[in-house]
Amino acid sequence: MFFKKYFLKEKIKQNSYFIWNNENKNIQIIKKFKLLDLDLIIGVDSQKEILLKNTINFAKGNFSNNALLWGARGNGKSSLIKSVFHNVLSKNKNLKLIQLNKNNMFDIEYIYSILGQYEEYRFIIFIDDLSFEKIDSDYKIIKST
């Protein structure tokens, strides 16, 4: 157990982009992270500014809100999140991003318990392609955590 915790600590310390691996219940490093320059994302200037300020506040430990971006598929929501994160990361090395697939939302409490051991870092959990259907109640797990 000591070695697992030590290696996880080193992995978190040395990297910033991760994805949750449901099979081994651990985070995996994302080595190639597709990024757009924040200035190339156009047409959503007010949303970009709000998300940027909120992420800066979060990285500094100040008041911030959870963020939910919605819109049609392919409109750049994921690109905006990744670009804002990368922009804020350049000045706040304590910031980390963990991508979580919708199918792994039930692991969120377990993920929180792991990340809670690393108080020196600020973790953004990014759930990509989250959709809500009338018969889908899976999202309720994130409401209560």
Residue ranges and their predicted role:
Residues 82-86:
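A conserved segment at the C-terminal end of the G1
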Residues 30-32, 56-64:
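Phosphate-binding P-loop
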Residues 1-29:
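Interdomain "pre-motor" coupling segment immediately N-terminal to P-loop NTPase/helicase cores
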Residues 136-145:
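Substrate-gripping "pore-loop 1 plus following alpha2 helix"
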Residues 26-50:
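Dynamic helix-loop-helix/coil hinge segments at AAA+ ATPase domain boundaries and subdomain interfaces
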Residues 41, 87-122, 129-135:
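AAA+/P-loop NTPase substrate/partner-engagement loops
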Residues 46-60:
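Pre-Walker A adenine-sensing motif
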Residues 61-81:
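Walker A/P-loop nucleotide-binding motif
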